[in-house]
UniProtKB/Swiss-Prot annotation:
Enzyme Commission code: 4.1.1.23
Chain positions recorded as substrate binding sites: 14, 36, 64-73, 120, 172-182, 197-198
Family annotation (InterPro entries): Aldolase_TIM, OMPdecase, OMPdecase_arc, OMPdecase_AS, OMPdeCOase_dom, RibuloseP-bd_barrel
Source organism of this protein record: Methanococcus maripaludis (strain C6 / ATCC BAA-1332)
Identification of the protein by name: Orotidine 5'-phosphate decarboxylase
Active site positions, chain numbering: K66 (proton donor)
Pfam families linked: OMPdecase (PF00215)
Catalysed reaction, written as an equation: orotidine 5'-phosphate + H(+) = UMP + CO2
Record-annotated membrane-spanning stretches: none
Quaternary structure annotation from Swiss-Prot or TrEMBL: Homodimer.
Keywords, comma-separated and alphabetical: Decarboxylase, Lyase, Pyrimidine biosynthesis
Keyword Lyase: yes
UniProt enzyme class: lyase
């Protein structure tokens, strides 16, 4: 890892080509702490892409599947995913039983379970924002490992973080979505993550862009 920083950098790698994904992951691995992949890459390439990225980078890989189903289905998705990945992201709005089903799998496999409270896009203010504090309370009660809260609205990030005190935060929205890194760093603390995706992987030189963000942290 390049230098020392209290706040960690998570690369959101939402490309759909296997070779490109592995190359970018490997090139940026010196400057990132964790790599987050989602449905675009896994649906295009299969679950084995997780193992390939881990092997190429020696970094943890978190699957951002935002799992949101009934408990029995959530359990199956978590089982399949966590046979490969180091962690999985689920939605909180489906309720405590559905989240607990994933938590049980995570605990059995010693893997991270991260729950969405409020997303970073404008549409999240229409519905999710109204129940984000309640979901943060649920995250605190269930003792999830981490929560998702938005970099695009630092005041919301701060409020949600103050509720789920024991969970680490992963915060999307810096870069292409317009979130300000300095504002976010004023809120986040040790063991929290800033998530940056397109600003790095769409750049002509992803390695240099990852380094640039790391040096600002």
């Amino acid at each position: 890892m390049y230098g020392e920083s209290l706040v960690k950098l998570m690369l959101a790698l939402d490309v759909m080509d296997e070779k490109k994904a592995v190359l970018i992951a490997k090139e940026t691995s010196e400057y990132v702490d964790s790599i987050k992949i989602g449905y675009p890459l896994v649906l295009a390439t299969g679950l084995n892409i997780i193992d390939k990225i881990k092997e190429a980078t020696n970094k943890e890989v978190i699957c951002d599947f935002k799992v949101a189903d009934i408990p029995s289905t959530n359990e199956k998705i978590a089982e399949l995913t966590l046979n490969h990945a180091d962690g999985i992201i689920c939605q909180g709005f489906v309720g405590s039983d559905s989240v607990s089903a994933i938590l049980n799998v995570g605990k059995a496999k010693n893997k991270k379970v991260i729950m969405v409270t409020e997303m970073s896009h404008p549409g999240a203010t229409e519905y999710l924002q109204n129940v984000a504090e309640d979901m943060a309370k649920m995250a605190d009660r269930l003792k999830v490992d981490g929560i998702v809260a938005p970099s695009t609205r630092p005041e919301r990030l701060e409020e949600i973080k103050s509720i789920a005190k024991d969970a680490f935060v992963i915060s999307p929205g810096v870069g292409a979505q317009g979130g300000n890194l300095s504002d976010v760093l004023n809120v986040l603390s040790e063991n929290d993550y800033v998530i940056i995706g397109r600003a790095i992987y769409e750049n002509e030189n992803p390695k240099e862009m990852a380094k640039k963000y790391r040096m600002q942290m």
